[in-house]
């Protein structure tokens, strides 16, 4: 029996649906329990009038990104460090531990693996078939969930289908009834431009029966109404502009909460749980804020908050916690006093908020001071320091086996060969091995289109930028790493991780310098006189470290200088770049429409062509047409280097373990190994770079 509750049933029936969370009770046992609780109205009223306490465990998954299995489709190998099938084991354990649980998903669920792309674009599932991610989640019986930004990556018709229908927007058949996701999807801050109403229901009210302990020590069952409300980042309007513009619009999370939380309370919700597909940012609030958790937590009426989007963790009891802003209490697990949790990503952890509830005989209230939050990780260490992984739930894999194998067969399709290891392990320090072929593919694709269709731009040079999308954020295995030898589709998916589409923008030489200055935020400012170690890499994401990989563009990055003053000697074809000269740059839809932090023009206004084709597909076709990939032709063009400087102390960075030969093969003579383990617990090694070479 699934753990979801059949809404609208009378109290006695509701009670019967509580116990399967803990035990598979037979009819006789259920009847006995009902009798023990009082089978007539007088006894029920007496129990309800007695003060009681209960614990409700809110269980969170977030940013699963379609990682149903602990399986890397880019390497065609098991990876026990992530996967919903292991999180499922933690969920089942929590349900045995806690009498009362509420299981919620926080979005970014339907995109992120080759299996996701297979079901959305390669061999789209029919309306009658449930997405395999949702099918696996159905084995656990989720109570509710919200939508992340990546739910919109495949467009509104697909989203309408996988949610079961009902999205009243232009271009979508809202009457189409499909298999759906299997739980209430809630989202309060995205509206249909057609109806001016929320795209999906802003909230849901779940009627549950709690197992509680009365003041006289007896176990009792008491009803509760739980409000669940969802919010996503307004950035969707930039990131998926091609799908959403003119069809939906967004509202700030705080404004939406101020509107709908009182509605929830008016409808009888005695407890409100906010599902925020966003995280924490100490900046002043704005309605377009990507990570408004600090501000949302201050909205009256919110009792608990689950977070995500940042692929980080809260609470974090490490020596250097991810979040330390004012109002953040990692020890208590609260944000401005509100119990909260952020459960990493990819199924690496289960978030648990233990809400302490009080019943005064008439209504429930939350004792926030007595509540607590924690993360339960699928990977831990034993006494000897060896990694220990939670076992996979055996019920999950069989549910998706046929689609899993179909996706594997698809990504095994051969497309070419490479004579070198194509990797982003050292992209941060100058190896273009996995970047150049992406730039070559994008440049050729855009140049051909302009030649055939946009003669007004035919005289402009066409260049391309790309970034190392996998640069170690998730640990030592989070790098693009394609072995020398045969190339298949899954290798191209490794080279280009996201389902972006190719965009072309028109900029000038001054814009290019500013663009590169923004990308150089990837590095910390290095003090040459400092004797101690200095970390080279900042918190600026690797996927934003845009770079050229062509002999035509050359420049240096001076990391001893502050942000904004690091690009030196920028040339085009051997001459200082003319600030006024115009260029066409091949990039992706995200950068072209939401890259204002790079240059103001990257707000969509500089776009001269928004192609319909995915960057990944463009790379696949390029390799098919040029199947013999070599280092000389496709992996050695370095557009940039660090400005040479001698430092008193070591300049260090982390990358994958046992990877020094990759740096050596790429000609990075200044890179050496300092420690086989950098101490992060993520399977990374510590390297140093001699900036004087």
Where are these regions (language model features)?
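Catalytic centers of hydrolytic enzymes
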Residues: 51-61, 66-96, 134, 139, ...
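Long, low-complexity, intrinsically disordered N-terminal extensions of eukaryotic proteins, enriched
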Residues: 24-28, 144
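Acidic, metal/ion-coordinating pockets
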Residues: 44-374, 440-444, 455, 611-614
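Bacterial signal peptide processing site
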Residues: 38-41
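C-terminal motif of bacterial Sec signal peptides marking the signal peptidase cleavage site
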Residues: 33-36
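Bacterial N-terminal signal peptides that target proteins for export
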Residues: 4-25
């Amino acid at each position: 029996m699934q753990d979801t509750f059949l809404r609208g049933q009378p109290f006695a029936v509701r009670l019967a649906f509580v116990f399967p969370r803990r035990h598979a009770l037979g009819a006789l046992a259920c009847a006995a329990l009902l009798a023990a609780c009082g089978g007539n109205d007088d006894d029920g009223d007496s129990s309800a009038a007695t003060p009681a306490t209960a614990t409700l465990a809110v269980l969170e998954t977030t940013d699963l990104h379609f990682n149903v299995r602990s399986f890397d489709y880019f390497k065609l190998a098991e990876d026990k460090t992530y996967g919903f099938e292991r999180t499922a084991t933690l969920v089942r354990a929590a349900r045995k531990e806690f009498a009362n649980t509420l299981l919620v998903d926080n979005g970014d669920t339907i995109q992120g693996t080759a299996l996701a792309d297979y079901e959305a674009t390669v061999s789209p599932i029919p309306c009658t078939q449930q997405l395999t991610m949702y099918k696996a989640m159905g084995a656990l019986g989720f109570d509710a969930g919200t939508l992340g930004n990546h739910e919109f990556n495949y467009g509104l018709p697909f989203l309408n289908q996988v949610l079961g229908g009902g999205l009243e927007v232009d271009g979508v058949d809202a009457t189409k009834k499909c298999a759906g996701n299997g739980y209430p999807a809630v989202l309060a801050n995205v509206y249909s431009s057609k109806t001016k109403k929320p795209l999906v229901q802003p909230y849901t009210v779940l009627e549950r029966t709690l197992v509680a302990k009365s003041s006289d020590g007896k176990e009792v069952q008491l009803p509760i109404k739980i409000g669940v409300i969802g919010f996503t980042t307004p950035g969707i309007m930039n990131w998926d502009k091609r799908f959403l513009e003119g069809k939906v619009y967004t509202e700030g999370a705080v404004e939406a909460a101020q509107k709908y939380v009182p509605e929830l309370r008016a409808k009888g919700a005695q407890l409100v749980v906010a599902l925020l597909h966003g995280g924490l940012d100490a900046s002043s609030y704005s309605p377009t804020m990507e990570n408004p958790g600090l501000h949302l937590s201050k909205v009256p009426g919110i009792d608990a908050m689950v977070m995500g989007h940042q692929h980080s963790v809260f609470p974090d009891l490490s020596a250097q916690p991810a979040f330390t802003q004012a109002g953040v209490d990692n020890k208590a697990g609260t944000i401005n006093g509100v119990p909260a949790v952020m459960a990493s990503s990819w199924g690496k952890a289960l978030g648990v908020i233990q809400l302490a509830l009080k019943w005064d005989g008439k209504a429930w209230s939350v004792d926030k001071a007595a509540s607590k939050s924690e993360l339960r990780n699928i990977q831990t260490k034993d006494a000897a320091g060896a990694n220990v992984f939670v076992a996979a739930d055996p019920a999950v894999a069989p549910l998706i086996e046929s689609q899993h194998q179909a996706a594997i067969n698809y990504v095994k399709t051969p497309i070419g060969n490479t004579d070198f290891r194509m990797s982003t392990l050292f992209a941060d320090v100058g190896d273009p091995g996995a970047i150049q072929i992406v730039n070559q593919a994008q440049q050729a694709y855009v140049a051909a289109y302009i030649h055939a269709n946009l003669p007004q731009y035919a005289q402009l040079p066409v260049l391309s930028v790309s970034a190392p999308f996998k640069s170690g954020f998730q640990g030592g295995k989070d790098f693009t790493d394609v072995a020398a030898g045969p190339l298949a589709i899954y290798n191209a998916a490794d080279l280009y991780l996201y389902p972006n589409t190719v965009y072309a923008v028109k900029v000038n030489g001054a814009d290019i310098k500013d663009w590169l200055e923004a990308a150089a935020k990837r590095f910390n400012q290095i003090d040459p006189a400092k004797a101690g170690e200095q970390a080279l890499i900042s918190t600026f994401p690797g996927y934003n470290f845009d770079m050229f990989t062509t002999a035509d563009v050359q420049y240096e990055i001076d990391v001893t200088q502050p942000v904004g003053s690091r690009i030196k000697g920028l040339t085009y074809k051997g001459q200082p770049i003319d600030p006024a000269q115009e260029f066409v740059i091949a990039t992706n839809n995200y950068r072209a429409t939401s890259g204002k932090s790079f240059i103001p023009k990257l707000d969509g206004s500089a776009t001269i062509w928004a192609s319909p084709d995915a960057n990944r597909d463009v790379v696949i076709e390029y390799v098919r047409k040029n199947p013999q990939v070599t280092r000389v032709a496709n992996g050695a063009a370095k557009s940039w280097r660090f400005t040479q400087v001698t430092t008193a102390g070591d300049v260090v960075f982390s990358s994958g373990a046992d990877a020094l030969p990759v740096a050596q093969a790429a000609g990075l003579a200044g890179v050496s190994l300092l420690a086989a383990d950098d101490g992060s617990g993520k399977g990374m090694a510590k390297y140093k770079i001699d900036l004087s070479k």
